[in-house]
């Protein structure tokens, strides 16, 4: 299907989820996850009205940036190795995977300006997922108070791939509650107003629990494997 048609359907579902939770759809931004599709397909998303694109490989991110038009906002959404930070930090608007002090130090070292980051939290406690434990987040953010180039824009999580909606909702709700705790710190470089959570299979629940960024791949742009894999 055309991306514009997929986006229309997704926007309808976003509106319905917002209506159920008393929110405005203006509070929710769609990140098109384009890591598995060609630059041409990603361009189709931008032409359809998508303003944010998400990549998880530095090489593919830079390749698409060179080839695409329309000046979309780029989000790095994958686990970021410290040695790859140099090629990413000054090329994206947001990094969604800050999860350790060594990476924060590398970002601080390489940044030419403010880098907006989401602290990744493993709310499901699955060993296969990256992210900090919930109890580690506030001490970590407090430790970032002296980092001049890092702005903690919000928190990010991924729910387990399950049909148990209560389990999914619990992960998203716990992230929102943790975000509220971070905001009470009143830390200048950690406004933490955003929540990056929800993907193709669970974004409606995420919206109901307060998501401000949702990461949509397969149901929006498909999964054509036209991206460069490493």
UniProtKB/Swiss-Prot annotation:
Look up keyword Repeat and say if it applies: no
GO cellular component term of the entry, any:
cytoplasm
Can the keyword Cell cycle be found in this entry's annotation? no
Instruction: List the PROSITE patterns hit by this protein, alphabetically.
Output: UPF0001 (PS01211)
Residue numbers of N6-(pyridoxal phosphate)lysine PTMs = 35
Which Pfam families does the UniProt entry name for this protein? Ala_racemase_N
User: A GO molecular function for this record?
Assistant: pyridoxal phosphate binding
Q: Which InterPro entries match?
A: Ala_racemase_N (IPR001608), PLP-binding_barrel (IPR029066), PyrdxlP_homeostasis (IPR011078)
Q: Which SUPFAM superfamilies match?
A: PLP-binding barrel
List keywords of the entry alphabetically.
Pyridoxal phosphate
**Sequence similarity:** Belongs to the pyridoxal phosphate-binding protein YggS/PROSC family.
State the function annotated in the UniProt record. Answer: Pyridoxal 5'-phosphate (PLP)-binding protein, which is involved in PLP homeostasis.
Annotated protein name in UniProt: Pyridoxal phosphate homeostasis protein
**UniProt gene name:** ylmE
């Amino acid at each position: 299907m055309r991306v514009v048609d997929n986006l229309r359907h997704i926007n309808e579902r976003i509106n319905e989820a917002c209506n159920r939770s008393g929110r405005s759809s203006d509070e929710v931004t769609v990140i098109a996850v384009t890591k598995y599709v060609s630059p041409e397909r990603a361009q189709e998303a931008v032409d359809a009205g998508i303003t944010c694109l998400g990549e998880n490989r530095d090489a593919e991110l830079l390749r698409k940036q060179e080839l695409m038009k329309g000046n979309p906002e780029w989000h790095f959404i994958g686990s970021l190795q410290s040695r790859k930070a140099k090629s990413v930090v000054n090329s994206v608007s947001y990094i969604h995977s800050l999860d350790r002090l060594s990476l924060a130090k590398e970002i601080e070292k390489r940044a030419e300006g403010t880098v907006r980051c989401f602290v990744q939290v493993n709310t499901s406690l699955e060993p296969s997922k990256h992210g900090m434990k919930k109890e580690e987040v506030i001490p970590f953010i407090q430790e970032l108070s002296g980092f001049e180039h890092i702005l903690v824009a919000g928190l990010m999580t991924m729910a387990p791939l399950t049909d148990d909606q209560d389990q999914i909702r619990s992960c998203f709700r716990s992230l929102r509650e943790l975000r509220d705790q971070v905001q009470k710190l009143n830390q200048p470089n950690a406004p933490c107003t955003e929540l990056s959570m929800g993907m193709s299979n669970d974004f409606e629940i995420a919206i109901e629990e307060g998501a401000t960024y949702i990461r949509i791949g397969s149901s929006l742009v498909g999964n054509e494997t036209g991206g460069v894999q490493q």
